């Protein structure tokens, strides 16, 4: 299956490829249909872990994950979405498998299952608007993406043009998920460090050619928030070089790592270097 470069669909695709031990290009629509039993169980286990319990409302508020009582289970809900495929153009993957006019309103695709899709034709939580063309396969993969999510102040995901990065990122997250679920991990007092998770991934490379975007989002309540940080390629390669020269800890002591996400590293780096040089000169004068 080709990537859509939608952050949720792509992360779900890599998660599925991880559990099926396949390359993403070898994933078929039949694989997605056949995976629903397995992946529904994985998601239920994941959100039942206290450490990650907030993610279900931050990602899929008003869904079968957050309101299971009296409604279909997540498994049944996803199976129902698959049955409501059509032959209209999907605005995410470009395939002709979407269906807008669905008789059973329970299976209209809205924000409860598809974060960050905003349009005049897209269903909101109250389902009083016309639907946007999104196929059920993209919806199912979007639900799977929760397994790659982490929480800082917001839920967040990475997306990259680098296939290697996405595979490494997914593998790292899923291994951590497995351990946390088995141990019944509790909520952490300190929020997950977004920059540190990036460092641990990219520093295994000798160089990095792709681009990385970080999506921070909250899809709870009647409004949704999303912020996209584009992480410059040169910043990623700088982290790699600092790691090679054992300077990464010094870099972080100057609190320069936080400027990677907002794209202002150069100016703040020069300011810190100037400050250090100035302090060194003052020390030299005092010693004279």
Residue map of PLM features:
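Conserved small-residue
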Residues: 1-73
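Basic, glycine-/proline-tolerant helical and adjacent loop/strand elements
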Residues: 51-189
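Hydrophobic transmembrane signal anchors and adjacent membrane-proximal interface regions, especially
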Residues: 5-7, 130, 171, 226-228, ...
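Glycine-centered secondary-structure boundary/capping sites
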Residues: 21, 94, 262-263
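Short, hydrophobic/amphipathic alpha-helical patches that form generic packing surfaces
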Residues: 10-22, 133-149, 196-200, 241
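Helix N-terminus capping/helix-initiation residues
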Residues: 28, 135, 262-263
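Short, flexible helical or helix-coil boundary motifs
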Residues: 20-24, 39, 43-46, 50, ...
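Intrinsically disordered, low-complexity regulatory regions
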Residues: 180-288
